[in-house]
């Protein structure tokens, strides 16, 4: 079966510093019209908005936004791939662009309620009670949430701009922004790509990075740090203001968010090195090697903060957050640096590494992990077809 046509990511516009893209889909149509007049194409925001305005005029197969073939961008001068991107490199970048938009969408929701709403990351007005529960994990959580959101916006914007500069189709998932928003005060009432209100969070990353003898690349299955999170469906943001009334329930929501932050960013930490092994051109490799480590920085930050989640039982659903320091080094909270473990072959000495980094089916593995997380609950069959098509194309890429 032929893969669905790749689509193009677009971000939304708010008057702001010219170098920061914005994510406000509720105002997108009006802002796109304004952006066509005089915005500088070197701006991340204006570049993507112009692409949106053009792409909207050229609906492709299945109703997905496609860029017209004419002059997607002026040819790169030096440093870039001569003759354009290889099919495989373009497929990898398109999948990563889609992944970054998905990340942007979920981080935007967290920022609206518990981050800092400003000109860099506008949207929403905050939920003081939820933000206070989040701050139990660290007093600077609002700044970290804001900055993680801004980083993901920049990743999506850059990758799409690079694709366009080399005559390849950028990606746009806007037609799939149909999932409901939180009804809690502070959240924008706009369509979303992701669902943060019915999550099933895999916390095996916690024990994976603390093990000195196991590695998923060898087929090892690591235990859950918070077993309950992987065994049900739980909100990581308040669904409505009713979720703010019971203190332990609200803290459980904040704790869930803390571990979800880790889950999302450990995925990116592995995905970039996994796909880097499949690229052909040195500059595309440079992109993956430059963005990937920022995901690792996010992951380590959130690992430190999640360790501060207070042990408790949610009185509304029985979700238990255990004392992670009660069972030894496998879950000890201050062990946030990757424990040396087996790599490549067991005959070699153990070494501190990112894991997994096996490249086979890496993109589809990421899609499956996010789906199992509950992040796409409520999404359409077409959405899954598009995302899996992008993943298959990325996984089919071959180096050289």
Q: Model segments located where?
A:
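Membrane-interfacial loop-to-transmembrane-helix junctions in polytopic alpha-helical membrane proteins
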Residues: 41-44, 86
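N-terminal export leaders
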Residues: 43-59
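N-terminal secretory signal peptides
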Residues: 1-42, 70
């Amino acid at each position: 079966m032929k893969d669905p046509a790749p689509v193009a990511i677009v971000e939304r516009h708010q008057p702001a510093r010219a170098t920061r893209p914005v994510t406000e889909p509720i105002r997108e149509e009006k802002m796109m019209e304004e952006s066509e007049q005089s915005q500088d194409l070197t701006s991340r925001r204006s570049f993507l908005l112009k692409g949106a305005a053009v792409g909207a005029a050229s609906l492709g197969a299945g109703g997905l936004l496609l860029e017209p073939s004419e002059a997607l961008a002026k040819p790169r001068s030096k440093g870039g791939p001569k003759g354009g991107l290889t099919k495989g490199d373009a497929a990898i970048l398109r999948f990563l662009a889609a992944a970054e938009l998905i990340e942007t969408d979920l981080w935007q929701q967290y920022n609206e309620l518990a981050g800092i709403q400003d000109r860099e990351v506008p949207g929403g007005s905050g939920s003081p009670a939820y933000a206070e529960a989040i701050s139990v994990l660290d007093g600077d959580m609002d700044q970290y949430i804001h900055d993680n959101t801004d980083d993901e916006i920049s990743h999506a914007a850059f990758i799409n701009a690079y694709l366009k500069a080399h005559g390849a189709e950028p990606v746009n998932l806007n037609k799939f922004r149909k999932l409901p928003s939180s009804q809690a005060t502070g959240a924008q009432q706009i369509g979303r790509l992701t669902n943060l209100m019915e999550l099933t969070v895999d916390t095996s990353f916690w024990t994976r990075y603390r093990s000195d003898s196991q590695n998923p690349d060898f087929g090892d299955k690591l235990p859950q740090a918070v077993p309950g999170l992987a065994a049900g469906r739980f909100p990581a943001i308040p669904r409505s203001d009713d979720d703010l009334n019971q203190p332990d329930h609200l803290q459980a929501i904040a704790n869930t968010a803390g571990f979800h932050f880790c889950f999302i960013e450990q995925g990116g930490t592995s995905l970039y090195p996994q796909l880097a092994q499949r690229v052909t051109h040195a500059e595309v490799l440079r992109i993956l090697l430059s963005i990937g480590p920022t995901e690792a920085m996010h992951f380590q930050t959130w690992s430190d903060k999640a360790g501060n989640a207070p042990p408790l039982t949610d009185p509304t659903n029985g979700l238990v957050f255990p004392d992670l320091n009660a069972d030894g080094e496998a879950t000890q909270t201050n062990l946030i640096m990757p424990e040396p473990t087996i790599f490549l072959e067991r005959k070699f000495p153990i070494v501190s590494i990112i894991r997994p980094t096996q490249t086979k089916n890496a993109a589809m593995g990421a899609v499956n992990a996010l789906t199992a997380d509950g992040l796409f609950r409520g999404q359409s069959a077409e959405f899954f077809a598009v995302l899996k098509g992008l993943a298959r194309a990325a996984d089919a890429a071959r180096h050289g």
